[in-house]
């Protein structure tokens, strides 16, 4: 059976065409519908999936696990203490071993080079569950959520608020540009995206007709926005920068004042989670005590408002990850896109 995705890796959004990403988003919606109606879709019957987690996760682990089981596969979780990537065994050797035992490999960790080496040497499809550079599975969930709310993607405006050089900002910028979505990064100059990432996005935007804007001006960034999106102020491994980030990013918090600047009652709010919108966590209490900040990247008011779609977005991680796994490892009929 013909399948143009068969055997391919999912490492970064830039490796896929607009038509391919749109197909994966639509296939995700189809699989979501099948699950809601309890219709089996076991594209990976009898397959074994390795889930490599150098970085911990709630949503990514849960999504890959449930998606694997729904597809008829067996997922095996290997955490940071279970794998020796680059420590006692090279990534190349680990990849060659796992590729002989598993049919597909998910990796969530720090280095993009590491996930690329797994892909190069394993001989099986490898899926990027997050690296410091890119977060491609998150993007499919994000843009599926946007499409569910607006019925389209092209011509919409998504504004990312906060740390403009993290993996989520990179991926939103490039994926949006590919899909014809206008992406604005609203960030302090010190945290603007890398020039290389902006140049890549601008190249795709030229083809799709999208607009790329990098600014520290709230009015310029947010007016006319369809989507406001934010992420944590400090990424994993950067905890020592907390005081600096709180001071730098407080003006970029998503609050009702910022929402009103968009002048769009149909606006939606997205967050890839976890979110620090109150003090109901150990982390939140600690930050409140040390820095006097009870709400960080988003206020509790916005987080619980009619605009919020982040729990739909979190659920969509499972459906979109399922689509990627089924398309690259299974046998759906996809002669062309």
Swiss-Prot record:
Catalytic EC class: transferase
Molecular function as annotated in GO: amino acid binding; ornithine carbamoyltransferase activity
Residues binding carbamoyl phosphate: 57-60, 84, 108, 135-138, 272-273, 317
Swiss-Prot/TrEMBL keywords: Arginine metabolism, Cytoplasm, Transferase
Localization per record: Cytoplasm
NCBIfam families: orni_carb_tr (TIGR00658), PRK00779.1 (NF001986)
PANTHER family referenced in this protein's UniProt entry, alphabetically: ORNITHINE CARBAMOYLTRANSFERASE, CATABOLIC (PTHR45753:SF1), ORNITHINE CARBAMOYLTRANSFERASE, MITOCHONDRIAL (PTHR45753)
Protein name: Ornithine carbamoyltransferase
Organism the protein comes from: Streptococcus suis (strain 05ZYH33)
Gene name in the database record: arcB
């Amino acid at each position: 059976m013909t399948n143009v995705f068969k055997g391919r890796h999912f490492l970064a959004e830039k490796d896929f065409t607009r038509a391919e990403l749109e197909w994966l988003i639509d296939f995700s919606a189809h699989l979501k519908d099948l699950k809601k109606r309890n219709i089996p879709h076991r594209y990976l019957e009898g397959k074994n999936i390795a889930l490599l987690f150098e970085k911990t996760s709630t949503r990514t682990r849960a999504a890959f696990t449930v998606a694997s089981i729904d597809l008829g596969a067996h997922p095996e979780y290997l955490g940071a203490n279970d794998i020796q990537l680059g420590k006692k065994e090279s990534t190349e050797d680990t990849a060659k071993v796992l590729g002989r035992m598993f049919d597909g490999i998910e990796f969530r960790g720090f280095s993009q080079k590491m996930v690329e080496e797994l892909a190069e040497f394993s001989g099986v499809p490898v899926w990027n569950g997050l690296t410091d550079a890119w977060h491609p599975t998150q993007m499919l969930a994000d843009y599926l959520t946007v499409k569910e709310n607006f019925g389209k993607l092209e011509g919409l405006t998504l504004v990312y608020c906060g740390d403009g050089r993290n993996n989520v900002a990179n991926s939103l910028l490039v994926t949006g540009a590919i899909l014809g979505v206008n992406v604005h990064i609203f960030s302090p100059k010190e945290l603007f995206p890398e020039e290389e990432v902006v140049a890549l996005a601008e190249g795709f935007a030229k083809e799709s007709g999208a607009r790329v804007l990098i600014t520290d001006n709230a009015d310029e960034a947010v007016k006319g926005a369809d989507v406001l999106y934010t992420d944590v102020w400090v990424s994993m491994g950067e905890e020592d920068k907390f005081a600096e980030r709180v001071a730098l990013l407080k003006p970029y918090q998503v609050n009702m004042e910022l929402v009103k600047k968009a002048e769009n009652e149909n606006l939606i709010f997205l967050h890839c989670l976890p979110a620090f919108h109150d003090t109901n966590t150990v982390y939140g209490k600690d930050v409140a005590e040390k820095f006097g900040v009870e709400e960080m990247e988003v206020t509790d008011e916005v987080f619980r408002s009619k605009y919020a779609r982040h729990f739909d977005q979190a659920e969509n991680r499972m459906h979109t990850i399922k689509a990627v796994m089924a398309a690259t490892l299974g046998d759906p009929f996809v002669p062309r896109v």
